[in-house]
Amino acid sequence: MAYMVVRHSVQDYDAWKSVFDSVRDLRKRNGEMSYQILREDNGSNALVALFEWDNLDNARRYAASPELKEAMQRAGVTGKPEISFLEEAARG
């Protein structure tokens, strides 16, 4: 399995989630299989998004796309996102 992990903060979670949901089809067309959004339990707007992708090449291509950059700007992402690409090594 191929994974992409994105860490960033947002100005307003609900506004961010609305934009995130609006680009669902774009993510799917580029190979996204599923996602999980995680928030810190202290109520902050620091998010971690874990995506399962069909392959790492598609994940990297999507992460570098102008469409993603534009969506992040519209969604109110603050600061520079941290993006990691991972392959599953073991599962329990």
Which residues are covered by each model-predicted region?
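Short S/T/G/P-rich N-terminal loop/turn motif that feeds into the first structured element of a domain
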Residues: 1-66, 70, 74-92
